[in-house]
């Protein structure tokens, strides 16, 4: 089964997730599409401003410094020196396994749909993707599109599930790999994995644990789909909760639950 990966251009945790996936499936993966970190119609600068307002100066500047370091390491070690011993970007991971990289602004465009058809793509894996996948794209992908979401669906649909899981003082988190349909985080679930949340876990702790589980869940999902007729869990909309970008009161609630960003 010919596969294609849609993944966010995030240098922190996603290179490790993609590396684990391609270690198993690089021979049957036709390409990796790297999507902007900006959500929906927001620009990168607007997204950065949203995160600054959410995180505050201290955590935001710490993330920015780490981001710059990761980008410099990727440029020097991976791009200029050509080393793939330590991959600091998702593009470097794809290069390590000899998988083509694309950076289409819109994966629903006729041009990109034709590219997928030319590659014979039958199945798409979305890892922290930032675009909605429209009907034409879904219909031409014979085995479907799956998305990995960092929460125990049907709860915590939408943005920043790790933050909301902590803000609501949950004792358990998880990841769900589900088929994509016309609604956000709505399709039937193929694989769901859980992890324990400890009393003083930080947002960084939970995001790291979530991404480690995500790699396992994605690999398990792909194997089930390739085997044919995977067992599915319901993802009922009437039991769902939806969340968007947190506001100041949500951050105060997050802190009242004795959690920190790092």
Feature annotation, model-predicted:
Residues 1-262:
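One-carbon transfer enzymes
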